[in-house]
């Protein structure tokens, strides 16, 4: 439920029991995160987890600070958990600001060169865009224009990108078709 994948078969059972466990958790880290997410006293749903809890946990990983989430989930001390959880909320806000900044730059690029969105796939790049969020940005560009999108961050002589596709266009096949131009792919 923290990623965009089809939920079926036994995975539905895992999610159901997982949500019940989160709602009734005695883990200080989850309790603090639930409180800081405004979910205290509420039944934790897949929507709550997807849009409030997971982004806070993932934000620090995207910013290169994943040990914070690990510490939050492992601590036995509620005061420490509350402090870490508060920091995760700050870090999530920072991640959102980084995303907004890049999206504004992309909007500016497209306004200056509207032909970028006329191709079958949108490929857009910028200098030193945060690599931890370019996948999220690619998803937003794809949603905005209804086309596959690749967002690339250029760091000196190296460029790293992330793409998102629409149904019916296997983006990974397109990437593999140009693998001779790439140093790495995944």
Give the label of every model feature segment.
Residues 1-185:
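Hydrophobic helix-and-loop "lid/oligomerization" segment in the mid-to-C-terminal part
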């Amino acid at each position: 439920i923290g990623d965009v994948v089809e939920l079926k078969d036994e995975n539905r059972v895992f999610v159901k029991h997982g949500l019940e466990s989160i709602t009734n958790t005695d883990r200080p880290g989850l309790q603090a995160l639930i409180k800081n997410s405004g979910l205290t006293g509420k039944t934790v749903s897949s929507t709550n987890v997807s849009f409030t809890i997971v982004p806070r946990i993932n934000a620090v990983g995207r910013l290169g600070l994943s040990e914070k989430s690990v510490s939050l989930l492992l601590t036995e001390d509620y005061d420490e958990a509350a402090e870490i959880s508060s920091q995760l909320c700050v870090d999530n806000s920072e991640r959102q600001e980084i995303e907004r900044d890049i999206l504004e730059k992309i909007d500016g690029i497209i306004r200056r060169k509207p032909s970028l969105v006329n191709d079958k796939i949108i490929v857009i790049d910028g200098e030193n865009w945060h690599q931890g969020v370019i996948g999220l940005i690619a998803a937003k560009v794809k949603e905005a224009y209804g086309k596959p999108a690749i967002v690339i961050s250029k760091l000196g002589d190296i460029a790293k990108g992330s793409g998102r596709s629409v149904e019916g266009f296997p983006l990974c096949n397109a990437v593999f078709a140009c693998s001779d131009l790439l140093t790495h792919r995944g």
